């Protein structure tokens, strides 16, 4: 049994970008199941084999990590085009890991055929005809189906908690107690403004010492419907393998979502935050059923509640340590089900 894993739109090299990191982590966790797996990308590397040097049909399974189909500046994107050519050659079912609601599977050919450089490719080279099974990180498969309604060859949908991969790796560790330099920390991107109202509500004008890391920038927050006076400190991107350590600098770390994530996707960021030395505080709308933690103290409805909860944690080390103990206990109980998670993954890819 041989498995190939690719990222549909990003070159996989190292841990400097989220898409590359995610693909490498998935490769590692699949390898740790005792399965024979290769990452295929643009070039041979420490973790990868080149698209040009392997035959996709030598593999019994092809797993694809979701990505957008964007040709920035109207120019060819070799990562996308090489990945889709690779997929188009495959003669068996393709397994699409749907970890981001914004990144459903799509064909590149409709986006290519009218470009000035379209003569470099043919429809036969790029059009993917194999049946596709979407493995959805979101539990609401109706949302996953709606995201793929325009794709004819997506024929199956199955829920699987993909995001747990990081905590099920052999070298996973909880963060150590860390000196606090921040009240609250949040990591993420602007996501085209889909979470702007939530970000402004919880992170701006709080009077707290808040850091916002990731590729969002203060100047993006300009929607007049969500006015603000004082922004958090924006500090830029960090490597994916540093997120829990970064979160640990704060007393609390915030989890928010948007309408397609609420009560649907539990994200990787949840587990990274739960593993940190920061108390995880969750927007109530993100998890109204308290699937993540069945304890109302971990949930906040608005800015005022966030401020109150953080101040409670600042003034009571007993409370802070109690809540940390609870979240770490829940994470460890989830990790104890590693064998079940591995079996469910194998079932999702029809092994």
From Swiss-Prot:
Reaction catalyzed: Transfers a beta-D-glucosyl residue from UDP-alpha-D-glucose to a hydroxymethylcytosine residue in DNA
MF terms in GO: DNA beta-glucosyltransferase activity
Major enzyme class: transferase
Keywords: Glycosyltransferase, Host-virus interaction, Inhibition of host innate immune response by virus, Restriction-modification system evasion by virus, Transferase, Viral immunoevasion
Domain of life: Viruses
SUPFAM superfamilies recorded: UDP-Glycosyltransferase/glycogen phosphorylase (SSF53756)
Entries under InterPro entries matching the protein: Phage_Bgt (IPR015281)
Pfam families associated with the record: T4-Gluco-transf (PF09198)
One BP term from GO: symbiont-mediated suppression of host innate immune response
Pathway listed: Genetic information processing; DNA modification
Coiled-coil residue spans: none
Enzyme Commission number(s) of this protein: 2.4.1.27
Oligomer and partners: Monomer.
Function summary: Catalyzes the transfer of glucose from uridine diphosphoglucose to 5-hydroxymethyl cytosine of T4 DNA to yield glucosyl 5-hydroxymethyl cytosine (glc-HMC). This DNA process seems to occur immediately after DNA synthesis since the DNA alpha-glucosyltransferase interacts with the clamp protein gp45. The glc-HMC modification protects the phage genome against its own nucleases and the host restriction endonuclease system. The glc-HMC modification also protects against the host CRISPR-Cas9 defense system.
Protein name according to UniProt: DNA beta-glucosyltransferase
Gene name for this UniProt entry: bgt
């Amino acid at each position: 049994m041989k498995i190939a894993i690719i990222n549909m739109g990003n070159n996989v090299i190292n841990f400097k970008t989220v898409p590359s990191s995610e693909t490498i982590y998935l490769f590692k966790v699949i390898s740790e199941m005792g399965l024979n797996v290769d990452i295929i990308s643009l070039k041979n590397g420490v973790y990868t084999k080149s698209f040009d040097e392997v035959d996709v049909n030598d593999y019994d399974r092809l797993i694809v990590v979701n990505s957008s189909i964007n040709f920035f500046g109207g120019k060819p994107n070799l990562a996308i085009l090489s990945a889709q050519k690779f997929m188009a050659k495959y003669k068996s079912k393709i397994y699409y890991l749907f970890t981001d609601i914004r990144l459903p599977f799509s064909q590149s050919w409709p986006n290519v055929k009218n470009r000035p450089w379209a003569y470099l490719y043919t429809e036969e080279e790029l059009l993917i005809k194999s049946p596709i099974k979407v493995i959805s990180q979101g539990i609401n498969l109706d949302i996953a189906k709606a995201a793929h309604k325009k794709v004819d060859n997506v024929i199956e949908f199955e829920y699987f908690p993909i995001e747990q991969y990081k905590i099920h790796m052999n070298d996973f560790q909880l963060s150590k107690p860390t000196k606090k330099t921040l009240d609250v920390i949040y990591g993420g991107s602007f996501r085209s403004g889909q979470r702007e109202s939530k970000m402004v509500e919880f992170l701006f004008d709080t009077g707290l010492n808040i850091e916002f890391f990731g590729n969002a920038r203060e100047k993006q927050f300009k929607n007049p419907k969500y006015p603000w006076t004082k922004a958090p400190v924006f500090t830029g991107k960090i490597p994916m393998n540093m997120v829990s350590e970064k979160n640990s600098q704060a007393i609390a770390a915030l989890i928010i979502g948007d309408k397609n994530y609420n009560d649907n996707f539990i994200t990787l960021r949840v587990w990274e935050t739960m593993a940190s030395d920061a108390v995880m505080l969750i927007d109530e709308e993100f998890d109204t059923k308290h699937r993540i933690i069945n304890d109302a103290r971990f949930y906040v409805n608005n800015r005022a509640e966030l401020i109150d909860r953080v101040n409670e944690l600042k003034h009571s080390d007993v409370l802070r340590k109690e809540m940390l103990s609870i979240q770490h206990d829940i994470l460890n109980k989830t990790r104890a089900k590693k064998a079940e998670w591995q079996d469910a993954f194998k079932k999702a890819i029809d092994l």
